Amino acid sequence: LSKLNLIKVFADYHENHEEFDNTVSFSIERVSGMKLIRKYRKSYMINDYLEQNNKVQCIIADHWKSLELIKTNKKKICLIHSKEINHPKGSSLNKKVLSVLNNVDHIVANSNYTKNLAIDLGVEEKKIVIINPGIDQVSEVPEKYLNEAEEILKGKKYRIITVSRFDKRKNHEKVIMAVRNLKE
């Protein structure tokens, strides 16, 4: 994207950010300060930037809160994850989420679960597209790690590996119980 267009990123300040910032092909404006104040400073900086740069075509946000205070009619895309939108229907937080998400052009959900949750909570279905998280494939696993894995799993007949956060809603315990029942 940055090879074809000018990209400007507004991001939170992190120690040693220069190490990362110097490796990318786009401009990063870092915003420091306490979290609550940072939210307002960042939105002020973005609104000011949009006023001064009329060639901006699209805003991409990683969270609905990032768009909450942005005042523009430019195209907006917002990424969503279930934990950040999962507020009881009709609650003040749910109403805030809906007022932001139903006023963006496109919403990118990271799973069918998140898409369905968003729809159930009142987000317009036609705006949602799913892009599942990707992974960086390892071209070759070092022998050391293969040996460690073999040692841990030595003598084990069944091997199940899950790559995810251990979260109640992911139902890991049901999978384990189902596998145990298969064994019997």
Language-model region placement:
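Nucleotide-sugar donor phosphate/pyrophosphate-binding loop at the beta->alpha transition
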Residues: 38-44, 74-77, 82-103, 144
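A short beta-strand/loop micro-motif in the catalytic core of glycosyltransferases
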Residues: 59-60, 103-111
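N-terminal strand-loop element at the rim of the active site
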Residues: 2-38
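Acidic anion/phosphate-binding donor-loop and adjacent secondary structure
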Residues: 88-91, 119, 134-152
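Short His-centered aromatic/hydrophobic patch
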Residues: 61-66
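Carbohydrate-associated surface elements
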Residues: 13, 113, 134
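Conserved donor-binding/catalytic core segment of Leloir-type glycosyltransferases
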Residues: 152-170, 176-179
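Nucleotide-sugar-dependent glycosyltransferase donor-binding/catalytic pocket residues
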Residues: 136, 165-168, 183-184
